[in-house]
Amino acid sequence: MGRRGKKKGRPVSGWVVLDKPVGMGSTEAVSKIKWLFQAEKAGHAGTLDPLASGMLPIALGEATKTVPYVQDGAKIYRFTVAWGQERSTDDLEGPVTKSSDLRPAEAEVKALLPKYTGVIMQTPPQFSAIKIAGERAYDLAREGETVDIPAREIEIGRLDIIEHHADHTVFEVECGKGTYVRSLARDMGRDLGCFGHISDLRRVEVEPFTSEDFVTIAELEAARFGAQGEDKPEPADDADAIDVPVDFGAIDALLVDTSAALDCLPQIAISDDAATKIRLGNPVIIRGRDAPVEAEEACATARGKLVAIGAIEQGMFKPKRVFAG
């Protein structure tokens, strides 16, 4: 008897702007979403720690080609720093490594904010996904090693105090790619002489998505299984498709269009004939009074549908990344 082949997922495309719950890892979330949609491909646009909640944009199908544009977008976090303790993981998960009876006044915290605004150098946490000699820093840290992680340049657009209390402060930060909020808590605690760690972390925005795009696991399950409720099937370990005919219309309606990730690029409307040529990898002349002559990157669309990302050189659109029609 021949071996049964692994089933191929659906060619569904779009973004799931998941409101990830505390306790779920980013990889686990991607597997869950891929299974719910029975998608052929899936990937996320920036890890969110299991102890954090909030926005985890997950790309399905053709949308995976736009992941780098979301990864480069600004992010907004709301987080709480508990004063008086530094922990090995810089959050609640690790043991206490340093402690202090000192607690900062709001004026002291406020005076520190300019130091952490703008382009700054930041050292990632020991427990991070940074690679050191080919190994993840968190793997080395779990083995008891203290590794030398070089500081790197990051950008913080703003850092605001939302609430201040005797033993903790709630902040909101808008930051660029590569920023570790846990490092912010650690470094501010050291500067204030009282130590600190993250006790609550929520990502509220990843450009270009907003909280209006949020969808929860419960909402996705309701759309996928409807009246099945608690009798819904559980995902297999390999996330293969289930052998039950399914209407995916309700859950697919919760997807954000693939093109939403490319709002940062110029949009060029082209004809159906031009779209056919581009999908075959051929350059086309861009027509129209307002068409740009030069652009490092632009999106070509036909009838409102994304066709390709490419460069415009001397009035010619040259595709770099083509999307299925």
Swiss-Prot record:
CDD domains: PseudoU_synth_EcTruB
Active site, UniProt feature: D49
A molecular function GO annotation: tRNA pseudouridine(55) synthase activity
Taxonomy, superkingdom: Bacteria
Keywords: Isomerase, tRNA processing
Pfam families, A to Z: TruB_C_2 (PF16198), TruB_N (PF01509)
Record-level GO BP terms: mRNA pseudouridine synthesis; tRNA pseudouridine synthesis
Gene3D superfamilies: Pseudouridine synthase
Coiled coil: none
InterPro entries per record: PsdUridine_synth_cat_dom_sf (IPR020103), PsdUridine_synth_N (IPR002501), tRNA_psdUridine_synth_TruB (IPR014780), TruB_C (IPR032819)
Catalytic activity line of the entry: uridine(55) in tRNA = pseudouridine(55) in tRNA
Keyword tRNA processing recorded: yes
EC number annotated for this UniProt entry: 5.4.99.25
Role played: Responsible for synthesis of pseudouridine from uracil-55 in the psi GC loop of transfer RNAs.
Family listed: Belongs to the pseudouridine synthase TruB family. Type 1 subfamily.
Protein name in UniProt: tRNA pseudouridine synthase B
Gene behind this protein: truB
